[in-house]
Amino acid sequence: MKVSGRNGWDDARMAIDVKIEQLWIPDSLDTPDAADFLAAVEVGRKVRMQTWGSDDLAYGPLEKLLEFADPYERQLILVAKVDGAIVGTVDIALPLTDHLDLAELTLDILPEYQRQGVGRRLLEAAEHLARGEGRTMILVDTNHPGASLHEFQQAQLVPGSGQG
């Protein structure tokens, strides 16, 4: 599938072939069928490294696998592949006991594939899936760095009283 820019223009820099598919969740991390799952988890780690300079906020493979046993949320992952390699993911959490109209999405795109329409394609596919599950509200989480504290010349985090 060809991805085009926002205004429908087709620029060679912005048009890449992207395949969106649901990720198979393995029973174990040490089987051959876990390769795509491990690659998807690695996308999240790389995005957090690029965004925060650390992978402290990234799920490890076992943590991610254990999420799928949560009795309160149905978890799904859609992946974006370019030339067979996973370049982006959208994790989809569908609450099962309350907020049944909600789908929570977490979007991660490898830095070298950002701003090329990959994220848009993943979000469109996730929205379609969520609507098919009867969800009418979507909450999207992405990782973006906040302003650096070094940018603040005046101690703006401290009230004028000096307390706090």
Model-derived regions: residue spans:
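Short amphipathic alpha-helix that is part of the acyltransferase structural core
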Residues: 2-65
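Short, flexible/disordered intra-domain loops and linkers
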Residues: 29-32, 148-163
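A short helix-loop-beta-strand connector motif used in the catalytic cores of GNAT acetyltransferases and
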Residues: 64-79, 85-88
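Conserved catalytic-core motifs of GNAT/GCN5-like acyltransferases
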Residues: 94-97, 141-143, 158-164
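Conserved GNAT acetyl-CoA-binding A-motif
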Residues: 102, 130-152
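A short, internal acetyl-CoA/4′-phosphopantetheine-binding micro-motif in the GNAT/acyltransferase core
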Residues: 106-115, 144
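Conserved acetyl-CoA-binding loop-helix of GNAT-fold acetyltransferases
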Residues: 115-128
